Amino acid sequence: MRLLIFSDIHGDKAALEKLMAVEADYYFAAGDLANFGRGLETMGPILQRRAERMYVLPGNHESEADIARFCREFGFHDFHGRTMQIAGYHVAGLGYSNPTPFDTPGEYSEQELKERLQRFSGLRPLVLICHTPPKGTALDRAGEGKHFGSDAIREFIEREQPRYFYCGHIHEAAGQQATLGRTAGWNVGKRGQLLELPTLVK
């Protein structure tokens, strides 16, 4: 099974067109299709050609209500706080970011991120898709080497050791890869990342 995961389109129609030309079994938009919630409606028709296989998370630029309405309108799957099984793997999604200085609509406190991640505890093998990266890795390194990721997400990864982790949010880290214990992680950015999941035999 092929999963295409991407993030931080921020209204870039050309980037989205390129992604939708990629053949995959599942598509995961990991947040920030728009800017402060504006322009989502212009992204919908581009994504719609993959509608039945499109799973969407809110980033920090969208609210839960924005994404719920967007998914209803265009026939996508709202994947915020949800799980599914693909080829024997659990796949889980959590949108929003930890607090930012910009007062964006999709932010949780670290405590709320921790509590929401708890529902994914014990799922193995796990593919975890979040908008926000873990703190203190190549995935959250911004300008001047500063790190802006989430402590709660890092703690969850270190404890639960998902097989794969995907995120966005920090634009400067797009395309970066990091390993936390047995977890392989990527900041997918607007170019996206393909994950080939072999079917697990039980």
Segment roles from a protein language model:
Residues 17-18, 40-42, 67-70, 140-142, ...:
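Short amphipathic alpha-helical segments
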Residues 13-17, 40-45, 65, 77-79, ...:
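A generic local structural motif
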Residues 1-45, 49-50, 64-65, 122-124:
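N-terminal active-site segment of His-dependent metallophosphoesterases
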Residues 23, 50, 72-75, 181:
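Short, structured coil segments at secondary-structure junctions
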Residues 34-35, 39, 51, 131-170, ...:
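Cap/insert and terminal regions of metallo-dependent hydrolase folds
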Residues 15, 69, 83-87, 104, ...:
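Binuclear metal-dependent phosphoesterase catalytic core
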Residues 5-7, 27-32, 54-60, 78-80, ...:
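Active-site neighborhood of phospho(di)ester-bond hydrolases with catalytic His/Asp-centered motifs
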Residues 11, 62-149:
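Conserved catalytic scaffold of divalent metal-dependent phosphoesterases
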